[in-house]
């Protein structure tokens, strides 16, 4: 792991401990620590993704946050900006790396504990830290950060 990825992992963990959900912790880390330009209005989109989309245990909120960061850096504002064929491979590749690293992208598979218990918070804290590290390495590798 690089110094940058370790820094991102620690910051994401601290954000989670301070009350951000998993998705918010990832996005807040990369917007504050890495300068990813996500404004407050866009940041609020993260709030519903915690607990695998509102505690549905579906798509991991940390994974959703990673897709938001990647899309902010590589995405488009208008269809004429660039074809989706340039963007989808980035998010698909990260999805595959996430699944390989953690065994699944589903919150229910990654987090077997009851929400808001000590075990849940400890498990998610560790996961958010590792996910932020994985994203940092990926962004560096793909040269997506300025």
For every predicted segment, state its role:
Residues 1-18:
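Polybasic, low-complexity association/targeting segments
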Residues 48-57:
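Transmembrane alpha-helix interface/packing and boundary motifs in multi-pass membrane proteins
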Residues 56-65:
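Conserved phosphate/anionic-ligand binding catalytic regions in large, soluble enzymes, centered on
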Residues 65-73:
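DPxDG-like acidic metal-binding loop motif
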Residues 86-146:
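C-terminal binding/interaction regions
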